[in-house]
């Protein structure tokens, strides 16, 4: 252990407590705590720079099962979606000064989904699924560019929007939400968003994990536990048949699709094949709530369940 930092917060264990992934640069670490305390610390020493209480400062509502939103750092700014009085904020990482705020007149609440940067032509934007719909915000000044209230997920909206190119975004969720393809266009500086198609949950509906987009294909685990490979037209290319994976994470790295099951079994799949093609399999965890996102870097994978974290060598050396 190089350093640690903690602050007191009263919480009850409910499938664990830590659901958000810190944003890290060579200078800063930004975290969102279970009850919406945003902390920025020095990446080398752990020295805290600043903290923002989203509940106190913005009237944010703590989501069920506590915070699930992952902060992002874009350049020298932390981008956060509080909900309450303010839909989104940009914070200077060095000082904690709020650089811009996006008003939230409809009082859409924070969800477990996270913000994703999306370029719309030459304009950089941030897209976020709030409780009342999906929105696009200017990265320059926080101005609301478009909103689509047609997309709502009851109880818990968890997956992040997936940019698939040409102004389109793929949205997916659990609790019978299914999926939606959205097309965002602009004319004369005015943006608009429309539904291209909607899929029933049994066709494609990801409960917890954000679907993967790779080489024109969308990958995800649907409610019955099958891994599905789907084209941008919303039609299945293949599925995993009798193989089931549950609520665990998946990631594409080095041309392979890694899928972790609820039981802690890691399966390697060929994402380019015309049918479900597993390449290898190994149990790496005990499996209790093995739902946290997988992280891959330098030929290694970090995975965890409720009680254990492991680092796996993917190079075969």
What is the predicted role of each segment?
Residues 44, 179-191, 232, 268-275, ...:
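Short loop/turn segments immediately following beta-strands, especially the blade-tip
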Residues 177-179, 264-265, 287-317:
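Blade-level signature of beta-propeller repeat domains, shared across WD40, Kelch, NHL, RCC1
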Residues 177-179, 201-273:
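Loop/turn-rich, solvent-exposed surfaces of beta-rich toroidal or solenoidal domains
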Residues 1, 39, 89, 135-136, ...:
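WD40 beta-propeller blade core
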Residues 26-27, 75-76, 122-124, 166-167, ...:
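Short coil/turn segments that connect the beta-strands within blades of beta-propeller domains
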Residues 34, 83, 131, 174, ...:
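Short loop/turn segments immediately following the C-termini of beta-strands
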Residues 4-23, 51-73, 83-85, 101-123, ...:
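Extracytoplasmic beta-rich repeat domains
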């Amino acid at each position: 252990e190089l350093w640690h930092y903690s602050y007191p917060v009263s919480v009850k264990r409910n499938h664990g407590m830590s659901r958000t992934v810190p944003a890290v640069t060579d200078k800063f670490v930004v975290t969102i705590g279970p009850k919406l305390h945003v902390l920025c610390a020095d990446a080398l020493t752990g020295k805290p720079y600043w903290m923002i209480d989203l509940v106190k400062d913005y009237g944010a509502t703590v989501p069920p099962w506590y915070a699930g939103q992952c902060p992002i750092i874009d350049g020298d700014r932390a981008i956060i979606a509080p909900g309450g009085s303010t839909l989104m904020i940009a914070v200077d990482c060095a000082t904690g000064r709020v650089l811009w705020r996006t008003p939230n007149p409809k009082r859409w609440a924070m969800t477990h989904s996270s913000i994703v940067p999306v370029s719309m032509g030459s304009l950089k934007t941030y897209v976020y699924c709030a409780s009342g719909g999906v929105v696009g915000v200017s990265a320059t000044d926080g101005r609301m560019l478009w909103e689509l209230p047609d997309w709502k997920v009851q109880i818990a909206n968890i997956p992040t929007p997936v940019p698939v190119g040409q102004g389109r975004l793929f949205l997916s969720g659990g609790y019978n939400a299914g999926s939606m393809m959205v097309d965002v266009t602009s004319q004369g500086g005015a943006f608009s968003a429309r539904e291209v198609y909607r899929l029933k949950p049994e066709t494609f509906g990801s409960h917890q994990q954000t679907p993967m987009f790779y080489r024109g294909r969308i990958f995800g685990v649907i409610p019955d536990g099958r891994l599905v490979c789907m084209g941008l037209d919303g039609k299945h290319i293949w599925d995993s048949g009798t193989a089931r994976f549950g609520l665990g994470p998946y990631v594409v790295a080095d041309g392979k699709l890694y899928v972790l099951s609820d039981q802690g079994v890691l399966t390697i799949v060929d994402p380019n094949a015309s049918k479900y093609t597993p390449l290898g399999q190994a149990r790496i965890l005990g499996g209790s709530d093995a739902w946290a996102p997988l992280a891959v870097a330098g030929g290694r994978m970090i995975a965890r369940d409720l009680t254990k974290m492991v680092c796996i060598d993917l190079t075969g050396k």
